[in-house]
UniProtKB/Swiss-Prot annotation:
The keyword Transcription applies. It comes from the Bacteria. The keyword Repressor applies. Keywords: Repressor, Stress response, Transcription, Transcription regulation. GO terms for biological process: negative regulation of DNA-templated transcription. SUPFAM superfamilies: GAF domain-like, Winged helix' DNA-binding domain. Negative regulator of class I heat shock genes (grpE-dnaK-dnaJ and groELS operons). Prevents heat-shock induction of these operons. Belongs to the HrcA family. This is Heat-inducible transcription repressor HrcA. PANTHER family: HEAT-INDUCIBLE TRANSCRIPTION REPRESSOR HRCA (PTHR34824:SF1). One of its GO terms (molecular function) is DNA binding.
């Protein structure tokens, strides 16, 4: 059955959620009447609050308290009411659609300071996002078949072992140990020279090719000089590609535990410990939620989150000309929508950053369900958009 709310009930739900997000205190009819121009008596507001509670949008933590939003109430707020400010008579009490007035400038500054040190850059971005949002920020590094090769180097690391180092165009380094080829007898004394010659050849042949393209690369037509190595080169590339395209469990740049501890919802040690344990020990579970794995775009597929267009998606068409980051889609899990039970008291907001329209990595905020949704959504969009441009 479709939920039908009167315009006044929509206003009251909107105001209740906004007030609770701002204060973390249950909201009563008197507070709403004093703080918002609803144009009705406290008795009428009280009746509407009771109706909103009956349909599951609000609840009372105890009998004498005001109301607070349920997970369902937050979902209606995010999917429907965020885009309705200044519409249907819903008041607009200083909304904050931008994550921080200087976020983009701060991201640009980090780019200049850290240059090609991608890992340090992503860690600093996670710290910045956590500081501005008051939530835990999680960023996965670039992965997937669209990352391309920039340089290849072969090194002898001991008897019978060769290390292949691959530097990608996103400034990451990947390595694998392989057995050396069967060197021709007249070249065994020139091992280092041969490895350098092969390194130069591989760099020239592979630069600009994605890891997906390496899987189908043919080594049948080689110059006479390298023909003896064709089988070994095929095995080497297969080893590198399989190692790179295998899901990376555990590599997540994170920050914000201290910020989250300041939230009143996490004053209970049990809740904080559950999140901390997930971040420290549950890398496989966490990557199952925020990782890309081998399926492009498999990030967050909650039916509840996708059952209606998000407010941000609705608003993006009117704001795209002002800020392209508003076109970045986000997926949101609220409370019990989270697949992990330890996050049933949390909201997760996530997006992907891309190259060539394919997902590279993820940007995620994890915080209480009482989250400043407008600001948090905008922050995730801004960071994802920046990483897409920076790693293009």
């Amino acid at each position: 059955m479709k939920l039908e709310l009167t315009p006044r009930q929509r206003k009251i739900l909107w105001a209740t959620v906004r007030r609770y997000i701002a204060t973390a205190e249950p909201v009563g009819s008197k507070t709403l009447a004093q703080s918002y121009n609803l144009g009705v008596s406290t008795a009428t507001i009280r009746n509407d609050l009771a109706t909103l509670e009956q349909v599951g949008l609000l609840f009372q933590p105890h009998t004498s308290a005001g109301r607070i939003p349920s997970d369902f109430g937050y979902r209606v707020y995010v999917n429907d009411l965020l885009s309705s400010a200044n519409m249907d008579g819903i008041p607009n009490d200083a909304p904050q659609p931008e994550p921080h007035p200087a976020l983009q400038q701060l991201l640009d500054q980090l780019n200049r300071e850290l240059g090609d040190d991608l890992d340090s850059f992503l860690q600093r971005v996670a710290q910045l996002l956590a500081h501005l949002s008051g939530c835990i920020a999680l960023i996965t590094p670039p992965q997937g078949p669209v990352v391309a090769v920039h340089h290849v180097q072969l090194l002898s690391v001991g008897p019978g072992r060769v290390m292949v180092l691959v530097v990608t165009d996103s400034y990451q380094t990947h390595s694998a140990l392989v057995s050396p080829p069967d060197w021709p007898d007249d070249r065994r004394e020139d091992l280092e020279d041969e490895l350098q010659l092969l390194s130069n050849f591989l760099t020239l042949k592979l630069r600009g090719k994605t890891f997906a393209e390496l899987q189908d690369l043919s080594w049948l037509k080689l110059d006479e000089e390298f023909r003896a190595y064709s089988h070994w080169l095929q095995q080497l590339l297969r080893s590198v590609v399989q190692r790179y395209l295998r899901p990376s469990l555990g590599q997540v740049f994170s920050a914000g535990m201290t910020e989250l501890m300041r939230q009143p919802e996490f004053s209970q040690a049990q809740r904080m410990q559950a999140v901390a344990q997930l971040l420290e020990e549950g890398s496989e579970q966490l990557q199952g939620m925020i990782g890309l794995y081998s399926t492009p775009g498999c990030l967050f597929t909650s039916e509840a989150a996708l059952s209606a267009p998000s407010a941000r998606e609705k608003a993006s068409s009117s704001t795209a000309d002002q800020d392209p980051s508003h076109n970045v889609p986000v997926i949101i899990y609220i409370g019990s929508e989270n697949p992990l039970e330890s996050l049933h008291h949390c909201t997760v907001i996530a997006s992907v950053y891309r190259r060539r329209s394919a997902p590279l990595g993820t940007v995620t905020l994890l915080g209480p369900t009482r989250m400043a949704y407008e600001r948090s959504i905008a922050a995730v969009q801004t960071v994802a958009s920046h990483l897409t441009r920076a790693l293009a």
